[in-house]
Each structure stands twice: as structure tokens, then as C-alpha cells.
Amino acid sequence: MQILLANPRGFCAGVDRAISIVENALAIYGAPIYVRHEVVHNRYVVDSLRERGAIFIEQISEVPDGAILIFSAHGVSQAVRNEAKSRDLTVFDATCPLVTKVHMEVARASRRGEESILIGHAGHPEVEGTMGQYSNPEGGMYLVESPDDVWKLTVKNEEKLSFMTQTTLSVDDTSDVIDALRKRFPKIVGPRKDDICYATTNRQEAVRALAEQAEVVLVVGSKNSSNSNRLAELAQRMGKHAFLIDDAKDIQEEWVKEVKCVGVTAGASAPDILVQNVVARLQQLGGGEAIPLEGREENIVFEVPKELRVDIREVD
């Protein structure tokens, strides 16, 4: 059985930065460190940080006075940010800079009194944080997930209207929604640069190339990871058997029985150790040496806050 690896796969710059912020805070300040929401949507990462003293909470009221608080990579609303400011807390922001870009787009639209439409998945923390950047009562902020949502939507003023997107959406699905928005609201204005992040786009492009060769595609990622779900869905749409797995233990032998080629990729919040474990399990089931496919090179790095820029090896 041939094993192919998608390229790129796994951690993106925003996830790397967010995890480093929590790790460095633990090294510098010691446990406990409070993190609002899972810092990234990966069970292995969250469990590892929890074992080292990170406490994951959903409400600022759960954080004691004088504590260290970190916002997750998904970002938070202005209301949450203001609540944290009102408390005796030391706050570090692990929001992905590419999510912050979308926040700024919404905030600008709010200041101008333009209504805004966000394309995203209801209930996702990134969506909640982005929607929470809009505060102008004279305007409006709306959420759509599909072309059907667009055709049902009514706004106050179609002449002053803009749209943004969640950063981890399906590129193809989002294109369909944007097409519907432009037909429904001809004067709507979009972002100068695509809101779907480079890592999401690159990983979807990579899984498309992977699925062209593999009969079965395994996506390493947690069930609550938006970008990981989109990878599995894309492979399924291409007619392949695709499975979203947290780790090697989730692999069922019948998935790869008599399969000649299996492809492996990982969502942007899944560490490479999990991919290595999956490959090892596939090799136990008859797989050969893993072959990485050619793909787009990624060299983007997002710096941690200057207060946390320390070599953790130097910290006792």
C-alpha cells in the first residue's frame, strides 16, 4: 500500500504563534495560565497544554484577579476584550493576525456606518469574535452560510454594504456565496485581499492534489476544527473515502483493506507528531514508506508579543 503525504499540511503560522504564546507564558510566569477557549482546535495540543498548567475557560468571570489570561487564536469580541480590561488581569492576545485583519475590516465598516455581511459558520468562536467587532446601531451585521441565506437576507441600505469571511472556510463554497452576494447586492464591496487565509487555501489545494491519486484520504484533525472538516469534505466531494481522525487510534483496518494508495493530510491545528503516528499505523497495516507530494512552500512567521519573546530554554 502506497502512502502519500499532502504538502503543505499541519501547523500554520497563526497556530504556531498561539501555542508559543501559551508555552512561553507558562515558562515565564508558571502555572496556572488561563486561556479563553481552546487556544487552537486540537485535542492533543489542548490536553498537552492542560497537563503543563493551562486552564481553558469560556467566561472571563472564571479567571481570578491577578491572573494571566490569553485569548485564543480564534479571537474575541470587543465585549470580551473590554470585560478583560476591566479586571485586574495580565492579558496576552493569541488571536491570529489574519483573523485580526478581518476584525479591522468589520470595525472600519462599523465606524463608517456601513452594514456588513460575514460569511461563516454560526457558533464558531472566530465568527462570534468577528461579529462582535461591529457596534454601530445605525448599521447592521449579518451572518450567512450559504447562497440560500443570501437570497433570504434583507438589509437596511444596499448602497452601503460590505462583506467579510471567516478565515477557515471552503474556498469553493465561499466562492458560491460571494457570487450570490454580488448578484443579490450589486454594489456590495469585498475585502481588498481575500479573508480566507493562505494556510486554509494551501491545504485545500494540497488535499485536492492528494485526492487525485489516493483512494482513501485520512485527515488528521479534531472534530471541532473548521479547516480540518473542510479538508475531509473536499476529498469526499472528489469521490474519495475520507475520514477525519484525531490520531492513529481512530484508524479502522477495514478503511484501508485492499487499498493500493492512501493519502494523509492534517489540518492547520494538528501537530506533525500525529501525522507521524498515523503513518506508523498505516505501515503496520501494510503501508510502505511515506512519500511527500510536491506543494506550495510556506515560510510565513508571526512573532509572539515582545513580552513573551524569550528562549524558554533559558527559563528555569
UniProtKB/Swiss-Prot annotation:
Keywords associated with the record: 4Fe-4S, Iron, Iron-sulfur, Isoprene biosynthesis, Metal-binding, Oxidoreductase
Binding residues annotated for dimethylallyl diphosphate, in chain numbering: H41, H74, H124, S225, S226, N227, S269
Binding-site positions, (2E)-4-hydroxy-3-methylbut-2-enyl diphosphate: H41, H74, H124, T167, S225, S226, N227, S269
EC number(s) given by UniProt: 1.17.7.4
Active-site residues, as the UniProt record annotates them: E126
Cofactor note: Binds 1 [4Fe-4S] cluster per subunit.
Residue numbers binding [4Fe-4S] cluster: C12, C96, C197
GO molecular function list: 4 iron, 4 sulfur cluster binding; 4-hydroxy-3-methylbut-2-enyl diphosphate reductase activity; metal ion binding
Source domain of life: Bacteria
Its job: Catalyzes the conversion of 1-hydroxy-2-methyl-2-(E)-butenyl 4-diphosphate (HMBPP) into a mixture of isopentenyl diphosphate (IPP) and dimethylallyl diphosphate (DMAPP). Acts in the terminal step of the DOXP/MEP pathway for isoprenoid precursor biosynthesis.
Name used for this protein in its record: 4-hydroxy-3-methylbut-2-enyl diphosphate reductase
Protein source organism: Shigella flexneri
